[in-house]
């Protein structure tokens, strides 16, 4: 019986499914073949990935050159395992931790965005400050330090941090003279969760950036930039000084969180 493999490409700001069927390939290359699937994946990225021109400017990525180079590794008789390996290598040329190729053969991941940089973070030092009587609420770990400064460690925005969790934490820390929000080594998660936490540090609506959407197949087909605002929470808000600790291993929704927090006058970012 003929085995069918499904390859799924997950990308930043887009979710694409590339299935090994003829409906997922260019019209001029028919059939469920290695060449057809290679051409299909290359074209999907060429037309829908957001950062090709940006990455050409930053590190010289030439997507047409990538096609020429990887096409030489495709042959009609290659196994599905070898095809998956070649396609994975091609996707990794993007150097994007948000873009992975997934199939029943496994999942390819670009890890250098995380592994190639120093941690600048010590669990033992953190444990020394947290001691043993720290509090954990959802995805937040917090403590009042000896100098009456609140310390909050947010390891991930993947956990569902609710408004009740934040109310509880801020009530506990309200006696503090200031607070440290530590998001070092936070790989990201839910942007909504990150915004929910940031909303506790502003009393007014604040412009935090702009966003454009991919609108067509051209590398520069984007909508006009639209402003992005952070709204204040309707519940308890922090009114004193705050410091955000970040490092090179803070990514994705965490980057959005840090960028938002740096717009607030009572917040200082370090890292």
Question: What do these predicted regions represent?
Answer:
Residues 23-213, 218-227, 241:
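Flexible, low-complexity junctional segments that flank or bridge functional domains
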Residues 146, 237-239, 264:
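Short, well-ordered coil/turn elements that cap or connect secondary structure elements
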Residues 233-236, 240-249:
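A conserved mid-domain beta-alpha-beta active-site/ligand-binding segment of alpha/beta enzyme cores
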């Amino acid at each position: 019986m003929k085995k069918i493999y499904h390859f799924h490409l997950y990308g930043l700001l887009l979710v694409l499914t590339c299935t090994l069927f003829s409906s997922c390939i260019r019209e001029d290359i028919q059939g469920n073949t290695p060449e057809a699937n290679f051409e299909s994946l290359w074209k999907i990225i060429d037309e829908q990935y957001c950062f090709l021109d940006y990455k050409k400017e930053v590190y010289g990525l030439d997507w047409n050159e990538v096609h020429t180079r990887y096409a030489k590794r495709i042959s009609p008789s290659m196994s599905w395992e070898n095809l998956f390996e070649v396609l994975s290598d091609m996707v990794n040329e993007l150097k994007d931790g948000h873009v992975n190729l997934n199939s029943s053969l496994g999942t390819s991941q670009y890890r250098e965005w995380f592994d190639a940089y120093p941690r600048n973070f010590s669990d033992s030092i953190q444990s020394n400050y947290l001691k043993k009587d720290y509090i954990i609420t959802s995805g937040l770990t917090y403590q009042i330090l000896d100098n009456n400064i609140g310390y909050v460690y947010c390891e991930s925005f993947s956990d569902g941090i609710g408004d009740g969790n934040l109310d509880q934490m801020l009530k506990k820390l309200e006696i503090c003279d200031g607070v440290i929000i530590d998001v070092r080594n936070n790989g990201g998660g839910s942007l909504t969760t990150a915004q929910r936490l940031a909303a506790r540090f502003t009393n007014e609506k604040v412009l935090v950036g702009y966003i454009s959407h991919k609108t067509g197949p051209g590398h520069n087909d984007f909508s006009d930039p639209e402003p992005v605002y952070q709204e204040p929470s309707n519940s308890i808000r922090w009114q004193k000084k705050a410091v955000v600790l970040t490092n090179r291993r803070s990514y994705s929704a965490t980057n959005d969180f840090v960028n938002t927090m740096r717009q607030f006058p009572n917040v200082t970012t370090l890292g």
